[in-house]
A protein has these predicted regions:
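Glycine-rich phosphate-binding loops that contact phosphosugars or nucleotide phosphates
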Residues: 12-159
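Accessory alpha-helical/coil subdomains and C-terminal extensions
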Residues: 159-167
Length: 167
């Protein structure tokens, strides 16, 4: 929870924040923008990594990247642009020691194991849950969620593996 809370604090301190990914991780970023809007009353737009160079970022901003491999070319390039612009950077990645994990200010390792096929279902689901947890934490910090509602969501997340097993 400490890493999740730390990332939520970065969102509270940022004047603007962007969620970024490409391909499957862009879909995770899209879903996540609704988590933040609905749970923390903050809208952070999802931007595709390959289009991020048109976004104006500065030192008060946070750029949150999502990458399964941690080596995604467009995402690395976009993070380089963000860092050059002075923005804070964070990422959720699946591969420890990857380029993206080394270049950001804060990294959360998702630990979902290797993807065996092109479809990144396991990694995408893990990243979605991490972003949901960050949005919940931010919602609690900002007073948008009561402690009871927060705990209920946490319990639901903890019971998810059992629900999957039943399917």
């Amino acid at each position: 929870r400490e890493q999740i809370s730390g990332l939520a604090v970065r969102f509270t301190e940022a004047s603007r924040a962007y969620l970024m990914g490409v391909g499957t991780t862009f879909y995770v970023a899209n879903i996540s923008q609704y988590f933040f809007s609905n749970l923390a009353d903050r809208y952070y737009p999802a931007v595709s990594s390959d289009e991020f160079s048109v976004v104006k970022v500065d030192s008060g901003d946070l750029v949150m990247a999502l990458s399964q491999s941690g080596e995604t070319y467009d995402t690395k390039t976009a993070l380089g642009y963000a860092k050059t612009s002075g923005a804070q950077t964070a990422a959720v990645v699946n591969v420890m020691g990857s380029a993206i994990s080394m270049m950001v200010d804060q990294v959360i390792m998702q630990g979902s194991g290797p993807e065996i096929c092109v479809v990144s279902t396991k990694a995408a689901l893990a990243q979605t849950f991490i972003m949901l947890r960050v949005a919940l934490e931010l919602g609690l910090m900002r007073g948008c969620l009561s402690q009871d509602v927060y705990k209920k969501h946490q319990q639901d997340l903890e019971s998810f593996p059992e629900m999957i097993q039943q399917i």
